Regions:
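Short, surface-exposed acidic
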Residues: 187-191
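ATP-dependent adenylate-handling active sites, centered on carboxylate activation for C-N bond formation
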Residues: 1-120, 139-186
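Short Ser/Thr-interspersed hydrophobic loop/turn segments at strand-loop and sheet-helix junctions
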Residues: 125-139, 161
Length: 191
């Protein structure tokens, strides 16, 4: 699916991107378009708001084992380990760029009063979501004239989710526990 869609994905995403899920979302949108869908709900939001990403769970597990600085989170979400970054960047380049860790910490400074995992959730909701995750469904849907709606990002729902204590968001190593538990009321548990 990559070779036949790469030009379309690059054109509609408006930038080169290393995220393979653009292609998967485009394929999903093609199937929806073929079936006459013009407006579709997506599931964007709960991973960011309810700290449902695997790296969030790893962060929480590490927090329970040791005092884990947020710099470690930054290094986990980077695509390249710091040792490799150091090998690729020459001295002149390094002198003229913003230190990514300093920049990351300046973003998080707005949420210094929150627990580290809640700082990460705030960052992912305000930076990662709009800068990456929401772009995928929006632009790949638009490529086929499909309007995507994100009901979990309604400010009323987001505000409720944000008030839920972290201990209730991840239970028994199940991410988005409350959402999944609530959803089971509507679906067969054997699905």
């Amino acid at each position: 699916i990559v070779t036949e869609n790469i030009e379309k994905v690059l054109f509609h995403s408006d930038q080169p991107h290393g995220d393979f899920s653009f292609f998967l979302i485009l394929e999903l949108c093609k199937a929806a378009h073929k079936n006459g869908v013009i407006v579709a709900f997506n599931g964007d939001g709960p991973d960011e708001i309810l700290t449902g990403f695997t790296h969030n769970q790893n962060f929480l597990a590490s927090q329970t084992r040791t005092n884990f600085p947020l710099v470690e989170y930054f290094n986990r979400i980077c695509f390249m380990p710091e040792t490799h970054r150091e090998l690729l960047l020459n001295k002149e380049f390094k002198e003229n760029i913003i230190n990514p860790i300093d920049y990351f910490e300046s973003i998080l400074s707005e949420w210094r009063d929150l627990d580290p995992i809640d700082q990460i959730a705030a960052y992912e909701c305000t930076s990662l979501g709009p800068g990456n995750n929401l772009i995928k469904t929006d632009r790949m849907g638009a490529a086929l004239s499909i309007e995507g709606r994100s009901p979990f990002l309604d400010h009323r729902i987001s505000e409720i989710f944000a008030k839920i204590p972290q201990t209730q968001k991840l239970q028994n190593s199940v991410s988005k526990f409350l959402l999944k538990d609530y959803g089971l009321r509507f679906f067969d548990k054997d699905l």
